[in-house]
C-alpha cells in the first residue's frame, strides 16, 4: 500500500494557519463593559466651578483692540516673503 507523505513544511504551514485562526477568534470575544469608557472620561473632567487661570479675579479677557492694526494685511509683500520656501540644509554644498 502506498502511504501519502506529508512534508514538514506542510505541517508547519497547517500549524501556522491554525494559530492565526485561533488568535483572531479569541480577539473578537474580548468584552468591554459599556460604562468603562464613560467613567474614564468623566473622571478626567474638573468637578465644581473652575477658577480663572489668570492671577486677577477678572477671569478671561478679550484681546486688545489694536491687534487688528498689528496684523499684516493679505495684500502686503511681507506675507510673500514669510511664506517662501527655503531649501533644506542637506542640499548643495
From Swiss-Prot:
Subunit structure: Interacts with CEP receptors (e.g. CEPR1 and CEPR2).
Superkingdom of the source species: Eukaryota
Family note: Belongs to the C-terminally encoded plant signaling peptide (CEP) family.
Propeptide: 28-78
GO molecular-function terms, A-Z: hormone activity
Segment forming the signal sequence: 1-27
Any one of the GO CC terms: apoplast
Name of the protein described by the UniProt record: Precursor of CEP13
Transmembrane segments: none
Function (record text): Extracellular signaling peptide that may regulate primary root growth rate and systemic nitrogen (N)-demand signaling.
Organism for this UniProt entry: Arabidopsis thaliana
Residues found modified as Hydroxyproline: 87, 89
